[in-house]
């Protein structure tokens, strides 16, 4: 999990650079508000609107057993999330 905090960052948003965790969160319905490619040009950060559910989802992604219902996701939703994130990642503007 890659959550970096600085004095300028807003607690309303969750930033993560892990592509597949971001795809999981997006497929689970979290709102993607930006893809930050400026802060670190070598590594984009996906910016989500933060919610109490987000912390639970990240924990489920990282620590539950792979066949746990908490970590399960419809394959089509996950593929669509990956496609959408890749589209947004390679767009010049969000």
Give the label of every model feature segment.
Residues 9, 14, 57-94:
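C-terminal basic regulatory modules in eukaryotic proteins
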Residues 31-34, 48-50, 64-66:
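Generic alpha-helical propensity signal that fires on short helical segments
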Residues 39-41, 49-59:
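Acidic, low-complexity, intrinsically disordered interaction modules
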Residues 37-40, 89:
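Conserved phosphate/metal-binding and DNA-contacting active-site motifs used
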């Amino acid at each position: 999990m890659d959550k970096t905090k600085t004095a300028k960052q807003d607690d309303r948003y969750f930033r993560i650079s892990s592509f597949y965790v971001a795809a999981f969160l997006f497929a689970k319905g979290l709102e993607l508000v930006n893809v930050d490619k400026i802060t670190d040009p070598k590594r984009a950060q996906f910016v989500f609107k933060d919610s109490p559910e987000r912390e639970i989802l990240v924990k489920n992604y990282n620590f539950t057993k792979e066949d746990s219902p908490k970590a399960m996701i419809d394959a089509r939703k996950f593929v669509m999330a990956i496609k959408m994130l890749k589209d947004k990642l390679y767009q010049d503007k969000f």
